[in-house]
């Protein structure tokens, strides 16, 4: 896994974060490159959901607003909405997940990415949580 990784434990759950990503209160991560954000769910989220058995992907070309539910991940435990961390247009989806949803469990920050957004306002990225802020967000919810 590229990028610096930190391991954290909150309420008995050990999970990894990457220092080069930004995060949301609803457990998504985003990586911004050349105006396009790659989005997935955090290691913490996949551990909470347990075995992921299905994914509903957004349509390419769909315009989305920050905070809008755009995808769904189904696990043996629950179904979770995945929210757009930034406003823009869906330009790519990870179709591998349709046959291999477990990639989200196996590699949430790599092969398990869910969709990509061409971002309307790259400045919006700075409003997302740093790894440290995300850990605090998880602590507030879990402890």
From Swiss-Prot:
| Keyword annotations | Lipoyl
Which InterPro entries does the record associate with it?
2-oxoA_DH_lipoyl-BS, Biotin_lipoyl, GCV_H, GCV_H/Fam206, GCV_H_sub, Single_hybrid_motif
Cofactor dependency: (R)-lipoate
Q: Which residues form the Lipoyl-binding domain?
A: 36-118
Q: Which GO terms describe its biological process?
A: glycine decarboxylation via glycine cleavage system
Subunit structure and binding partners: The glycine cleavage system is composed of four proteins: P, T, L and H.
Return the similarity comment: Belongs to the GcvH family.
Task: Please report the name of this protein according to its UniProt entry.
Answer: Probable glycine cleavage system H protein
**Gene that encodes it:** gcvH
